Amino acid sequence: MRIFKLFLLSFILITPVKANTIYNLIKIPNLEIYELKTPNNLKYFYAEKPFVLGIQKNISCTNSDKQTYDEKHQIISKNLNRYSKQFLKKINLKYIVMCENLSISGINTAGIPDHLMKTLIIDLKFNEKYFERVIHHELFHVIYDGFKELFNEDEWKKFNDKNFKYADC
């Protein structure tokens, strides 16, 4: 009987830990594991339910369906497998979160990189035509955000035509 009580107690204590482990790692609620063992050591998660996050609770994303997760995961992993695990470790990227309708303050966005949390959130339906390009674009935001001291804005601007002006946001 004592062994049974110990087993029951350990089961009760361990079960909630697994459910909260993902949240404790990357501070995004309602995620489930999609794939953990990848050639480049990236860990893939998907939104099981919609989530809201951020200091101002202004970042939101919704869950998708299994078919979309499966199709888009194939594309995302094919593209990110181009990068070695050493490179991804150096730029501090470890987690990929898949969801739909990703927005910041109500404005839709293709992805949100967070180099501090080692995470890239990708909207699976933001732009079908340029989806693969978006993956690399967001990856380079991870690089830029993590190594700003290496990027000289004035040098970058010199590549533009002298009459070029960025549009107002």
Language model segments and positions:
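N-terminal low-complexity, Pro/Thr/Ser-rich intrinsically disordered segments
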Residues: 21-56, 60
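Auxiliary, metal-adjacent structural segments of Zn-dependent hydrolase domains
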Residues: 51-118, 125-128
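Catalytic Zn2+-binding segment of zinc metalloproteases
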Residues: 139-156
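Structural recognition of the beta-strand scaffold that forms the well-ordered cores
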Residues: 119-122, 142-144
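Metalloprotease/metallohydrolase-associated module, dominated by Zn2+-dependent proteases
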Residues: 158-169
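Classical Sec-dependent N-terminal signal peptides that target proteins to the secretory pathway
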Residues: 1-20
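Short alpha-helix carrying the canonical HExxH Zn2+-binding catalytic motif
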Residues: 127-144
